[in-house]
């Protein structure tokens, strides 16, 4: 039986994808049945991080070693990830939500519609306030754009006002939010967004 929603999490290396998945699992695991597939090129570091954080039971986390371009494994030939998702769905037949975390990639990364239903793209403030206006599919067309690590803005000389202005310009009416995984700011917004994507899921109270 398929899960109700497959969610792709993409973004550059170091943008905070795994930390956001951890926070989302902590926020939603008492309300939804969740599993995670992580992608790394040669290791399973992200899967180990989630396991060690106890965000989910270890058997609900599957690490995939892509052995090559991270973009290929989520777009052109997503079979390795599709198999991993299907294995989790076979083992846990009441899944509401499966996260598929891509390996770190550039602003051109996008998921195959055969693999996920919804794409969340994550960038971080530490990369500079110019990132939103650089565009790319993740910035302009993802179902939700997340601008993470807002606590670092002052330290790196980035303006959140500029990032907000450019994000509104690039995304028009598509949703986006700021987050800080250290404090949890913005995580509830993402969690609510995901719950609203699941037609028959147990809604947040």
UniProtKB/Swiss-Prot annotation:
A Pfam family: cobW
HAMAP family, per database record: UreG (MF_01389)
GO MF annotations, alphabetized: GTP binding; GTPase activity; nickel cation binding
Family to which the UniProt record says this protein belongs: Belongs to the SIMIBI class G3E GTPase family. UreG subfamily.
Protein name listed in UniProt: Urease accessory protein UreG
Binding sites annotated in the UniProt record for GTP: 11-18
Compartments where located: Cytoplasm
Main location: cytoplasm
Annotated InterPro entries: CobW/HypB/UreG_nucleotide-bd, P-loop_NTPase, UreG
Magnesium is among the record's keywords: no
Subunit structure, interactors included: Homodimer. UreD, UreF and UreG form a complex that acts as a GTP-hydrolysis-dependent molecular chaperone, activating the urease apoprotein by helping to assemble the nickel containing metallocenter of UreC. The UreE protein probably delivers the nickel.
Domain of life of the organism encoding this protein: Bacteria
NCBIfam families: ureG (TIGR00101)
One example of a Gene Ontology biological process annotation: urea catabolic process
Disulfide-bond pairs as recorded: none
Keyword list, A-Z: Chaperone, Cytoplasm, GTP-binding, Nickel insertion, Nucleotide-binding
Function: Facilitates the functional incorporation of the urease nickel metallocenter. This process requires GTP hydrolysis, probably effectuated by UreG.
GO cellular component labels: cytoplasm
Native organism: Prochlorococcus marinus (strain NATL1A)
